[in-house]
């Protein structure tokens, strides 16, 4: 008799102590949402309602730890779900230097709450998944969380009905030819007055980010060595200027703003450990590192953008900047110290 998914999970967990649910699901050949669904009536419960309602209710629970990740990077931030703007398909939870999120809510498909026994004690969380079964965002209780408010939220949203997960395969992006010449893309780029116009430029011209970078002049985009992330984090830690680190997936982008306290490499990973923020990023998976300069009404905004071999954007880094103010000269100086990659090599 074949084992249930839950029994397979228990076996995989016993065989691979210390591995996270995401990794166990991969070993089992299923999505993390399917794995979590199998745990319902054990250490998980299904939550009803749409993501907006759940996110709005989280405002009452006080401080939590929020985790957003992709295959290559994990972004952990302590904060509160305050200052929410969740209209339409796009949403904001806007708390710079605290919990700062950009949400693409049409990607949010299911949610669960988990109560897990760990070697550090019981761990409570709410976890959101997309239509493909990948985790978009996770919310963990901390010592500062208002537990009566957390329990009240769960009482409101836990459902005894356990509908089947309606998973959809990820449609492969259409391979299309760019619709504009390199010269036209370069001219459009130079005409931008806001960094958010960049998405429209890509869409209009059927371009990926990297195709756009290759189309424009080296004063707008150029490649640097893949060690640049570690180099830049160390410089920012030494000089103590505020930077921004973006990590996202199909449905959520989480943003850190602040000074870097501690940078620690470990095996293939580069890690940042702050009191209220942690970054874990697999440095060996960085296939391309680009410096980009985008014009705004306040002058150019410079970023380091990191990509995996499959084209996934792993992370983006900026200097801290307030709307209406020019970019930090210190950030530009730090970027200028990075080693250019010899693209002809």
UniProtKB/Swiss-Prot annotation:
The keyword Transport applies. Part of the binding-protein-dependent transport system for hemin. GO terms for biological process: iron ion transport. It comes from the Bacteria. To Y.pestis HmuS. The keyword 4Fe-4S does not apply. The lineage of its organism: Bacteria, Pseudomonadati, Pseudomonadota, Gammaproteobacteria, Enterobacterales. Keywords: Ion transport, Iron, Iron transport, Transport. This is Hemin transport protein HemS.
């Amino acid at each position: 008799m074949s084992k249930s998914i839950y029994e397979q999970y228990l076996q995989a967990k016993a065989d691979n102590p210390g591995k996270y649910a995401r990794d166990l699901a991969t070993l089992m050949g299923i999505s993390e949402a399917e794995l979590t669904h199998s745990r319902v009536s054990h250490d998980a419960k299904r939550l009803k309602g749409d993501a907006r309602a759940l996110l709005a209710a989280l405002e009452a629970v006080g401080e939590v730890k929020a985790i957003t990740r992709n295959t290559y990077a994990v972004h952990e931030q302590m904060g509160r779900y305050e200052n929410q703007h969740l209209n339409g398909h796009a949403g904001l939870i806007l708390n710079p230097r605290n919990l700062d999120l950009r949400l693409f809510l049409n990607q949010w498909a299911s949610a669960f709450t988990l109560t897990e026994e760990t070697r550090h004690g019981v761990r409570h969380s709410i976890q959101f998944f997309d239509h493909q079964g990948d985790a978009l965002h996770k919310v963990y209780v901390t010592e500062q969380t208002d537990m009566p408010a957390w329990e009240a939220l769960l009482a409101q949203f836990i459902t005894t009905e356990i509908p089947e997960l309606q998973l959809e395969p990820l449609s492969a992006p259409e391979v299309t030819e760019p619709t504009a010449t390199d010269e036209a893309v370069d001219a459009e780029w130079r005409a931008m007055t806001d960094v958010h116009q960049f998405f429209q430029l890509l869409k209009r011209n059927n371009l990926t980010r990297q195709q756009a970078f290759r189309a424009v002049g080296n004063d707008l985009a150029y490649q640097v060595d893949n060690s640049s992330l570690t180099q830049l984090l160390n410089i920012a830690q030494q000089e103590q200027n505020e930077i921004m680190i973006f990590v996202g997936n199909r449905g959520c982008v989480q943003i850190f703003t602040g000074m870097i306290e501690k940078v620690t490499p470990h095996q293939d990973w580069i890690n940042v450990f702050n009191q209220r923020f942690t970054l874990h990023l697999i440095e060996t998976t960085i296939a391309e590192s680009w410096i980009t300069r985008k014009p705004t009404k306040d002058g150019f905004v410079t970023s380091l953008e990191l990509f995996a071999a499959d084209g996934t954007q792993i992370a983006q880094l900026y200097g801290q900047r307030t709307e209406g103010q020019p970019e930090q000269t210190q950030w530009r100086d730090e970027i200028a110290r990075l080693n250019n990659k010899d693209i002809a090599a």
